[in-house]
């Protein structure tokens, strides 16, 4: 009986660690992404975030997000998006329906860029066929 309990506990621990370490995005060929990540990219574009953070998230007057997303958690990102950093010129997006609905996709997109898995430029849905050169 104790052996069975240990096996179940080990299995549960392994299963939870896999879920925790899973990427928040799915990407193929650098620019084909899952629907949530694609919506995050569209949110990035609609909000014109590149004006401060650069077209490739390299930073301009705002910090380089390809570096920042290596250091902050998803929860910290959410708090930052909602509250902003007014003292540094970062607006809050608490009143933005678009951000309220798509902040997780925006996080997934930026995390994928930060991880080097998603390339800069136009993204397409995972199921869209992409012409190979």
What are these model-derived regions, one by one?
Residues 15, 43-46:
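Processing junctions and N-termini across compartments
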Residues 1-9:
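Bacterial N-terminal signal peptides that target proteins for export
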Residues 31-42, 51-92:
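Gly/Gly-Pro-rich "capping" loops immediately C-terminal to redox-active cysteine motifs
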Residues 22-36, 46-47, 91-133:
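Flexible coil segments in periplasmic/lumen-exposed cytochrome c-class electron-transfer proteins
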């Amino acid at each position: 009986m104790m052996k069975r309990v240990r096996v179940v506990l080990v299995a549960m621990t392994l299963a939870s660690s896999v879920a925790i370490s899973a990427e928040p995005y799915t990407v193929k060929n650098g620019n084909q992404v899952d629907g949530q990540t694609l919506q995050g990219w569209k949110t990035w574009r609609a909000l014109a975030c590149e004006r401060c953070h650069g077209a490739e998230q390299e930073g301009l007057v705002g910090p380089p997000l390809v570096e920042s997303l290596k250091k902050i958690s998803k929860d910290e990102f959410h708090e930052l998006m909602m509250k902003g950093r007014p003292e540094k010129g970062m607006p809050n997006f608490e009143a933005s329906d678009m951000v309220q609905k798509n902040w997780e996709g925006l996080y997934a997109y930026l995390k994928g860029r930060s991880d080097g898995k998603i390339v800069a430029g136009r993204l397409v849905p995972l199921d869209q066929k992409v012409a190979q050169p």
